[in-house]
Amino acid sequence: MRWYVRALGGCVAVAVGLLLSPASPASAHPKPPKPPPVATTSTTLTASATSVAQDSWVTFKAQVTSNAGTPAGSVTLTDASDGSILGTSALVSGTATFTTAALAPGTRQLVASYGGSTSFAPSSAAALAVSVAQTGSDAVTYQIDPSHDGRQAFGAPDASALTQKWNVTLGGTGGSLAGAGDVSYPVIAGGRVFVTVENTQTYGTNLFALDASTGATDWSVGLAGTYGFSALAYDGQTIFALNYDGLLTAFSASTGQELWATQLPDQWAFTAPPTAYDGVVYVSGAGYGGYVYAVSEADGLVQWEGTVENGDKSSPAVDDSGVYVSYACQQDYRFSLSGSLVWHHTTSCEGGGGSTAVLDGGNVYGRGAHDTPVILSKSSGTTVGTFASQTAPAFDGNNMYTIDNGNLVAVDPSGSPDRWSFGDGTLVTAPVVSGGAVFVGSSTGMVYAVSAATGQQIWAGAAGSVIMGPDEQNADVLVGMAVGDGLLVVPAGNALAAFGN
């Protein structure tokens, strides 16, 4: 700025200059310090099991690590297969834990995502695949289910694309192959395959729980008892083992821990597989006449006993309508689930040598040691027909599948002519059916998948050893195949083969 003064008269003009500096902007402040760098992290995810049945509990652990210390914060577990969030858990010493039974059936892709913090960057684990078998895909007793109908409604492998997943040889005492006898029919449940193996050097058997994915032994336990008989059933994440002397023992299916043991009273020869159904284990025993027992799955207490002519060899067949057993001389029984006798189909003879009955629709298919197999009405016990089969028949809602003279035959249950026949006279196993295919084994060691509709061969594979048929009268170990949790499992001597996709 300049000021000017003009001279008046003789005065002199003076110029005054004033320089003002511009003011600093009001928004200018000192810059804040830079934040510390955010450390990188890595997240990994593990599971207590990667092959489970639907509704089974699985524990996941997400571990978050960093070179800069132990991360804090939380991790979210997501099923990337459908985008569902299974939960969020806080890190404790770098690990977040999730326990869930909410996995849907199928192969699920689980992802753990760490959200990060002020000091640690977010990160996600690689997807972890968990195979979840649909409920109902378990094989829980002889011939798959409590009706013994050989039918697996869910969990069937693709019969046209079967390959051998594993083959294991199972031994006698202490896992040694010394004394190894025959392998029993398998029970398939909760990501495991359960079998018993006869010990030919001593009395008793061994119970094995195998990883269904690999065939590796998860746990095993010796089952004492007279002779080499034992048999299994499964329900409620519990495996039930019965020995020849009538000792019924419950084990945790996941750990092998013994939960309880009950000595069944009054009889001394137990030669039929148990059947577990809706919280109760049903057992047939012989010696002094015979009994059918109902035992609580929760505590092993005997709930009731039903008297029969002879209690050997016939595994109880059970559904909502009652408990059915079939003995020699066509001595067949139906008990209510509460233990009262509903009917007794009898003939003029008595004797031992029963065989496992099969339930399908409104009928009971009964077999004795030396009798013509008979078809009885479930409601009344009256005879409605006969059938021919060397083994327990299987059903799929369309056909009855039998083994007749070493061939697999599809029978129209209404009595029409046979629909088809397959085989060369060497087929020996009780058939099982699932996913539109009938599976059967040959004494040559071959296993076949046959179209249920046409009888045409879909697939054939080798079990690796001789396959035996079920000798319900003479053998200590009852053998048979099973389908469950996406596997076809086949005993062959002292080995067990599993086929899948």
Task: Please report, for each region that a protein language model flagged, where it lies by residue.
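Short, tryptophan-glycine- and acidic/Ser/Thr-enriched carbohydrate-recognition patches
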Residues: 144-156
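C-terminal segment of classical bacterial N-terminal signal peptides
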Residues: 17-25
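Short beta-strand-to-coil "C-cap" segments at the C-terminal boundary of structured domains/repeats
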Residues: 133, 497-501
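Short loop/turn segments that connect beta-strands within beta-propeller blades
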Residues: 211-214, 252-255, 296-300, 336-340, ...
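N-terminal secretory signal peptides that target proteins for export/translocation
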Residues: 1-4
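A short beta-strand motif characteristic of beta-propeller blades
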Residues: 164-176, 216-222, 257-263, 301-307, ...
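Solvent-exposed beta-strand/loop surfaces, strongest in extracytoplasmic domains of secreted
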Residues: 6-11, 25-141, 159, 167-170
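Repeat-blade elements of multi-bladed beta-propeller folds
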Residues: 62, 138-146, 177-207, 221-249, ...
